[in-house]
Amino acid sequence: GQQLIIPAAGLYQPSAAESPAPPTQAGKAIVVSVSQQRIYAYENGQMIRSHLVSTGRAATPTVLGDFRVYVKYLADDMAGPGYFQPQVPYTMYFYRGYAIHGAYWHNSFGRPMSHGCVNLPVDEANWFYQWAEIGTPVRVIA
């Protein structure tokens, strides 16, 4: 018979033509597309992984621009106006209080849900956390 391979939810790999350009052709880089609600990992200009994310809602948008991972925490308590989220897993801050991290409190990836951070399923956040280093470029585009 015929063998079908069905990727895990959210792990659809866009073609190179569909994926945004990385900020560098050398080394590792991360791109987050707010309009696509998707994160991309690149090595030497080649996309190696992509997954659905949840970025900031309209009232609390994710910051756009070019940044770098400046600190990583295996888990971090996060708080802001009206919320406290303890032990947020696999947190990588890239600009002030904006981070890429795991979200154990929702499973609505693919649509804006956050207070400005880039939410990933916990297992995907683990992959990005293990792969990325301090200083890895992060580009957030509309």
PLM features per residue range, with description:
Residues 16-57:
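A structural motif detector for short, solvent-exposed N-terminal "entry" segments of globular domains
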Residues 2-3, 13, 25, 36-37, ...:
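Residue-identity detector for glutamine
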Residues 23-25, 57-66, 71-142:
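Exported/periplasmic cell-wall-interacting domains
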Residues 9, 44, 53, 72, ...:
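Surface loops and adjacent helix of pleckstrin homology
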Residues 1-20:
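Extracellular LysM carbohydrate-binding repeats and other cell-envelope/extracellular binding modules
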Residues 6, 50-51, 102, 115:
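Short capping micro-motif at the N-terminus of alpha-helices
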Residues 6, 32, 53, 69, ...:
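Hydrophobic aliphatic residue packing
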